[in-house]
Amino acid sequence: MSTAHVLTTTRRGALGLGAGLTALGGALAVAGPVLAAPTATASTRLDTGVGLGSGAVGTQSVVLDQPAVRQASLDAVRALRRRMWGKNPPLLSLDGASGGTVQSYAAQEGYATVDAYADAVVWDQDLERIAVQRLAECIDMGKIQHSRPNGEASSTATIGDIATGTYEILAMTSDTSAGITTGIDMWAGEYDQLVAEGGAWSHATGHLHTLLNPSVTHYGFAASSGYSVGQGLWSRGGSADSTGWSGTYDITLAGGTDEAPAASVQTDRPAPSGSGSSSGFQHIIRSFWR
């Protein structure tokens, strides 16, 4: 039995975004609001602290285990970077003006060894909060896309000094038991295409590029019900601790539906058969420029 899954990525204004947020990050490092992590035994209402945007406010029930997601995702991304250091595929900056290979690009960013490159990956609680918010919104919509249930762009999911957008990567599989490592494996599946495109960021390489880009070091991930969400940014101030959210939560969102469709029957278009994947997965890859 094959498992359908979907990928989508966005480069938030790519070149213009980079200059704007780098300047902001260099001038001011402000962590997002600190919210107590409730202990959920039954369903607990949760406000992530992320801006909801316009529209009527409702909730979406989501089962979270963010401490486990934090550890698993950090381990997986660091391990991925170590593997890619050894393979040393081409990797360019977003504008193509710098880079070369994983190792040479990492060295340009100040990471001269595999340990330095892999260990540069750190958790960012503000990005985690955005990831959890976007997870709830994707589950509510029954699909992954870089917009929100109220129709606004995902870049409106802001918190603290993260006010312009992030590098957002999304994945969805009909295997609702799949965790964040499945999502990371799906994103890493773009290796051959990254090589074919000479290391450039594109619609078909953006997920893996976001995980390997040595200028992107801060990440937050969330996963539930077959959905995986990643948020990335360059080095910034903020807490490296998990929110600690673990249990069933009714997460607030704007413009949501009364009942979320099942992920197993939701794709953006029919999944092509015979993808050739050794895992038996069928692939749909979608990417967006913002």
Predicted regions, residues:
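Residues marking the start of alpha-helices
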Residues: 3-5, 117-119, 199
